[in-house]
Amino acid sequence: MESYLTVIEQNGQLLVDSREVAEMVGKRHTDLLRSIDGYVAILLNAKLRSVEFFLESTYKDATGRSLKHFHLTRKGCDMVANKMTGAKGVLFTAQYVSKFEEMEKALKARPSLIDTYLDMNEDERAIAYFTERKAKRELQEQLTLAEPKVEKYDRFLNTDGLMKIGQVAKAIGIKGMGQNNLFRFLRENKVLIDGTNKNAPYQKYVERGFFQVKTQETSVGIKTITLVTPKGADFIVDLLKKHGHKREIAS
């Protein structure tokens, strides 16, 4: 299990994002949403407060569409975990219990914002203010780069759930990283082959489920096409980030 949960504080509640939960437990986000909708309906029918478990919200995908997701409280995570069996359920439980406890300890140890500002002079307050804004921008950037594992690519996927490299470039939306530059970047980083079989993926990345290679008949013969899975697109985003290529996030 390579995914990790991020616990956030919102209006005094500690929450995790259903998109991260779906990735961690190996489910499509749409399937998890369907399950949560079912849990919410049962809770409401029993006249229980569903907001103590799940808080419905929206986010914008790479194309600007508003899509549904949920924030899960610790109780909500308990409910999802209770429906799971096997190693994924155990690992998910271990992750969210640990992350919630870490966040709770951090909040208890954190001095109040008012106390902090009272101890500062005017210059220090200004520095603290802009430092906090910078931290928020960096957090937003991280969330954007890590966002919607399935929904992010929906409009670019073909009927087999695959994308061409040019479609990946459009989906991730990094300035200056169009199709040709993305091909070049992947060749330079030994993800795609340079030379014979140019732009075909190395076998180890095919075996990891990042790429598929298809053949297509053209007027000049058979052409080989490299296609990317959603998992492969996320791998490419992480690789770009590692090499300093980031989306421009508005302040």
From Swiss-Prot:
Keyword line? DNA-binding
**Classification via InterPro entries:** Ant_C, Phage_regulatory_Rha
User: Which Pfam families would you find in this protein's record?
Assistant: ANT, Phage_pRha
- GO molecular function annotations of the record: DNA binding
Q: What is the protein name stated in its UniProt record? A: SPbeta prophage-derived putative antirepressor protein YoqD
Q: What does UniProt list as this organism's lineage?
A: Bacteria, Bacillati, Bacillota, Bacilli, Bacillales
